[in-house]
Regions:
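Short, polar/acidic, helix-capping and beta-turn segments at strand->helix junctions
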Residues: 1-127
Length: 127
């Protein structure tokens, strides 16, 4: 089975040794995606804005791997403050209101960069 690696240009990809997304067959897995724009943390911006940026990066990776946003079947939203889940949910709902993938919101202690408030993982199945 062929394996396609997708990079978003994050400086952490070569440092840690991971891909933004990996496609094997019809499956696309998107790594935990932080609010990084042009190789730098997009901060200080709020949780809603960070979530929107993460979702844009996730969508771009899925599209680059030959999928569509509509092919996303699962998302995992990691937050440093679960009491603010509605801010992230608003951004998530704007993208996925009609697609409605399986979704989990989880609180974590912190991320690599303390300015990050959210990271998002996704799985897609290309029809």
């Amino acid at each position: 089975m062929s394996r396609q690696l997708i990079s978003s240009g994050s400086p952490f990809e070569p440092q840690i040794g991971f891909s933004r997304a990996v496609r094997t067959g019809s499956r696309i897995e998107v790594s935990g995606t932080a609010p990084i724009r042009d190789g730098k943390t997009a901060a200080p911006i709020g949780l809603y804005e960070q979530t929107k940026l993460c979702l844009e990066i996730v969508a771009a990776a899925v599209i680059e791997a030959g999928g569509r946003v509509e092919d996303i079947v699962r998302t995992r939203v990691f937050l440093t403050d679960i009491s603010r889940w509605e801010e992230a949910a608003r951004a998530h709902g704007e993208v996925f209101r009609d697609i409605r993938p399986a979704c989990t919101f989880v609180e974590v202690k912190r991320f690599i960069n303390p300015q990050w408030l959210v990271e998002i993982e996704a799985s897609a199945e290309v029809a």
